[in-house]
Design a protein with these regions (language model features):
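Core catalytic region of metal-dependent phosphoesterases/phosphodiesterases
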Residues: 1-36
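Divalent metal-coordination and catalytic microenvironments
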Residues: 2, 27, 44, 88, ...
């Protein structure tokens, strides 16, 4: 789920979960499913919250996390299967050293709309939650334990802050190969 869907849930204007399930969708918010593809297991999870908590010295601290979130992430990474986490906000893993803490093969993310405005030779101008001239607004990024993070520019725009300019919308297709 993204921030717009979370907003619908907060306003309680509709039974979004019920409508999604009725349409056949599987909602993976702090949840995961193991699926079989050509005799290989892939674990797919979903997370909107931040995947970190910071202690008094500014370091990643699993013990300071909300226990439900910590337990979900520890359970999610406890498999030999290939692990894909869908996390709307890339900052869920880039802040607080979370990308160097959790053992996840691939995080798929968006939220920053490619930086809204792309300046030639400089990249994205503004990324939600990352601020001005953000690093993680599109492309593939690698970390110590989160092996790959793909951040898509997506299709939308944050028209309240900046209109999308010089920033071609995208849908990312990922081919997984053994």
């Amino acid at each position: 789920l993204g921030n717009h869907e979370i907003g619908y849930l907060d306003r309680k204007t509709s039974d979004l979960y019920g409508e999604l399930k009725k349409a056949g969708a599987v909602v993976l918010e702090k949840n995961y499913e193991d699926i079989k593809v050509k005799n290989h297991t892939i674990r797919i999870g979903g997370l909107y919250e931040y995947a970190f908590a910071v202690d008094g010295q500014g370091k990643m601290s699993k013990k300071d996390m909300n226990s439900g979130l910590r337990d979900f992430l520890m359970d999610f990474e406890d498999t030999k299967a290939f692990k894909i986490m869908m996390s709307h906000r890339p900052d869920s893993f880039i802040f607080g050293q979370a990308a160097d803490t959790w053992k996840i093969d691939l995080v798929v993310s968006g939220h920053a709309h490619g930086g809204q405005v792309i300046l030639p030779g400089m990249g994205g101008l503004y990324g939600a939650d990352q601020g001005w001239f953000p690093k993680y607004v599109d492309g593939i990024h690698h970390f110590r334990t989160v092996k790959n993070m793909i951040v898509t520019r997506g299709l939308g725009s944050d028209k309240e802050k900046l209109p999308r300019f010089n920033n071609i919308p995208e849908i990312v297709v990922i081919d997984l190969k053994k």
